[in-house]
């Protein structure tokens, strides 16, 4: 108990000392956004790299110019029950928050396979089925949706919402918007593409030599290999569509309509899959 309390105190201190905060539910791809921003800032400010994603070290090199970013775990929402998710975000008051979301069905599928294959340090190994998991009280689909809803328009907190899907469809464009939101000025436009190319999650094989991520930073969505003989090209565009039973998809769609506010910046209606 004391150890957990002291850990929360240290995190709170880091949030208070920071200029901007990166926040996401686990399995939303936050490491990718973090390292993309880190590569961009090393290029823009002409700083030495160090450990990829370590914003504190970048800030220490030039405190007068570099915004101090902190990647927050936001009280580990994947370990919470729905009624434990807090709407109150006053700890982030006065900060610029970058909130990353992802299609919740992909998030919950990815989280299930991570827990059922390897588990979490702070969670027990999950033995149930995917259909069981999405209906769990602790860290289930309802918890995820209520967490998303809590970040729709929190009082007195500035939030720039980024979707995982947009991040991968147009990483340079998303990076440009994020840098403007963070107040980074006089940017050479070519740096956005350069940062993308130096980030392994976006830049292909050449980027792997230009920027070395921390171990495990670029885990792909943890979905099992298909055993039905389908080729990659024949698989649905959304990974979750091949993981859930039709009843589960219908249930999750109803949950999304019930818990996500109408103004939540996400796809309220499903896109047709070709």
How would you label these PLM feature ranges?
Residues 1-161, 234-274:
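PAPS-dependent sulfotransferase catalytic domain
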Residues 57, 61, 177-180, 198, ...:
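Residue-identity detector for glutamine
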């Amino acid at each position: 108990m004391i150890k957990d309390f002291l850990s929360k105190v240290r995190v709170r201190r880091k949030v208070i000392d920071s200029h901007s905060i990166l926040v996401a539910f686990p399995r939303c791809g936050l490491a990718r956004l973090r390292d993309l921003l880190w590569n961009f800032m090393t290029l823009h400010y002409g700083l030495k790299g160090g450990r990829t994603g370590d914003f504190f070290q970048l800030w220490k090199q030039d405190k007068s110019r570099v915004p101090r970013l902190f990647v927050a775990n936001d009280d580990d929402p994947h370990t919470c029950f729905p009624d434990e998710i807090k709407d109150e975000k006053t700890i982030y008051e006065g900060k610029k928050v970058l909130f990353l979301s992802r299609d919740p069905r992909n998030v919950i599928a990815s989280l299930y396979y991570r827990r059922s294959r390897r588990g979490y340090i702070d969670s027990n190994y999950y033995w149930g089925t995917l259909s069981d998991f999405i209906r769990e009280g602790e860290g289930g689909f309802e918890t995820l949706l209520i967490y998303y809803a809590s970040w729709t328009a929190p009082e007195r907190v500035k939030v720039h919402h980024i979707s995982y899907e947009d991040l991968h469809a147009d990483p340079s464009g998303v990076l440009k918007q994020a840098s403007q939101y963070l107040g980074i000025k006089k940017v050479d436009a070519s740096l956005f593409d350069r940062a993308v190319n130096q980030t392994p999650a976006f830049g292909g094989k050449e980027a792997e030599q230009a920027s070395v991520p921390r171990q495990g930073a670029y885990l792909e969505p943890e979905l099992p290999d298909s055993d039905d003989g389908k080729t990659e090209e024949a698989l649905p565009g959304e990974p979750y569509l091949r993981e859930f039973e039709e009843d589960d998809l219908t249930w999750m769609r109803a949950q999304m309509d019930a818990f996500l506010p109408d103004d939540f910046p996400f796809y309220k209606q499903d896109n047709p899959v070709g």
